[in-house]
Amino acid sequence: MKALSKLKAEEGIWMTDVPEPEVGHNDLLIKIRKTAICGTDVHIYNWDDWSQKTIPVPMVVGHEYVGEVVGIGQEVKGFKIGDRVSGEGHITCGHCRNCRGGRTHLCRNTTGVGVNRPGCFAEYLVIPALNAFKIPDNISDDLASIFDPFGNAVHTALSFDLVGEDVLVSGAGPIGVMAAAVAKHVGARHVVITDVNEYRLELARKMGVTRAVNVAKESLNDVMAELGMTEGFDVGLEMSGAPPAFCTMLDTMNHGGRIAMLGIPPSDMSIDWTKVIFKGLFIKGIYGREMFETWYKMAALIQSGLDLSPIITHRFSIDDFQKGFDAMRSGQSGKVILSWD
């Protein structure tokens, strides 16, 4: 079958032919319809330090997708041929304390689809049936293909009560923009997002944020004054991994504020810990999606009127995958969809 693979320990990704995966007793075989390019896939393409330490070569990559069930393991119940599905890309062990306690997203033995095992940038994908999620009929293939990153956004945004709160989102990448849209949709008062990429800030404006702030040109404190905010932000969603953005967040949080961190900062990032301590801030690390509570919330948010369509900016045939990766690497895109039909 046709597949996009990391074939060499160097920059790039290559179309190749690989054997169709075999279906185990507890697995589903999924015929891929659409995939989306993740920032992780760009890291793998670029062959950065993280990729060199993490990705075995060769490896079929990709973990954002929607497809159709075409094969079912003999032990599987609850699915049938023809079901339209996406799936949780974190494969968990099922026997550690967190798995047995129902906190599977915190499994210490997690492996990643398209990272540690073959991914979805292929005509067919095999995953455990437990990881598959049926897509409701009123959710499009395009939206279903970005459920994985949308789940990161939902998990981060809904970590805290947002109704009536003032929310700061640092980082206007696709996940940050979706998190801001979720916050606004569920009842936050002011949702302010910051970045230095004007293209992506404009996407955030299309998604309905209160203010999208280019911090290279505009002061966040001035924006807060404009909005009549006198005490700081109640909730911070750190999506950028940029030390200056996190330091600004600490400066502008209200006392007792809560911060959810999805962005990955450098290991040597230095902050003023007195601000965390004396403001009584609560900081929560976010990894992946809660299985499967986040997935049910994703579907419900879309079904209740949350419009994610502006975040999808580019669509290509899989044969034009290079154009898709070029768009993602340029920084002048939202989500990029690759069609396998």
From Swiss-Prot:
PROSITE patterns: ADH_ZINC. Pfam families: ADH_N (PF08240), ADH_zinc_N (PF00107). Binds 2 Zn(2+) ions per subunit. Gene3D superfamilies: Medium-chain alcohol dehydrogenases, catalytic domain, NAD(P)-binding Rossmann-like Domain. NAD(+) binds at I175, D195, R200, L262, G263, I264, I286, Y287. Zn(2+) 1 binds at C38, H63, E64. Its cofactor is Zn(2+). GO terms for molecular function: L-threonine 3-dehydrogenase activity; zinc ion binding. Keywords: Cytoplasm, Metal-binding, NAD, Oxidoreductase, Zinc. This is L-threonine 3-dehydrogenase. The lineage of its organism: Bacteria, Pseudomonadati, Pseudomonadota, Gammaproteobacteria, Enterobacterales.
